[in-house]
Every structure is written in structure tokens, then in C-alpha cells.
């Protein structure tokens, strides 16, 4: 029986890794071993940061809402508490968008939150 070598399989595997490593710096996009090491690391970063992104955006929304609340003479925590007591169910993404793009609507929400706290 003839000996089977890995020529085609190896070439395909190397091409796949090097294709995914496009844009990496220096040897990390040219040499298979370095590319493979960096690619494994990159996939770990990607996995981690897909989860981190959700936390980062929530923090950003809270900062924006807090800034708009302060302009309306109410703290963030009292604002959220007031909205809950007034049965206004808007998530932080929508509230942050209102705070940035529609100050009048946000001021009306802040007024409702203040009234609910009284």
C-alpha cells in the first residue's frame, strides 16, 4: 500500500489559518506557527469581549442617563426608582437615547419620576 502524506490536507489547513490571520502584524500573518498562536489568542479575546461589550454599553447608558438626570435636578438612582413606582418600563438603552436626542421627552420622564416619589 502506498504511503499517504499530508500535502493537500496540510496546505488547506495552513491556508485556512493564514487567511484568518490577515491583518496581523509581522510574522503573525506570514508564518503558520506564529499565526496559529495569535489566532487562538485572538479568538479568546473575541469571546471575552463579546460579553464585555454588553457590560460596557450598559455602563455608557447609565453615565448618559445620570448626566441628563443631573440637568433635571434628580439623581440617577432616584430617577430609576421613580420610573419604577410610576410603572414606566423603559430600558436603559431607550432612556440613554432619549437623554441624548430628545431632552424635552427626557425632562417629562424626569418630572413623572419626581412626582411618583412624592
Swiss-Prot record:
Pfam families: Ribosomal_L20. Keywords: Ribonucleoprotein, Ribosomal protein, RNA-binding, rRNA-binding. InterPro entries: Ribosomal_bL20, RIBOSOMAL_L20_CS, Ribosomal_protein_bL20_C. GO terms for cellular component: ribonucleoprotein complex; ribosome. Disulfide bonds: none annotated. It comes from the Bacteria. SUPFAM superfamilies: Ribosomal protein L20 (SSF74731). Coiled coil: none annotated. One of its GO terms (biological process) is translation. GO terms for molecular function: rRNA binding; structural constituent of ribosome. The keyword Ribonucleoprotein applies. Belongs to the bacterial ribosomal protein bL20 family. Binds directly to 23S ribosomal RNA and is necessary for the in vitro assembly process of the 50S ribosomal subunit. It is not involved in the protein synthesizing functions of that subunit. HAMAP family: Ribosomal_bL20. This is Large ribosomal subunit protein bL20. The lineage of its organism: Bacteria, Pseudomonadati, Campylobacterota, Epsilonproteobacteria, Campylobacterales.
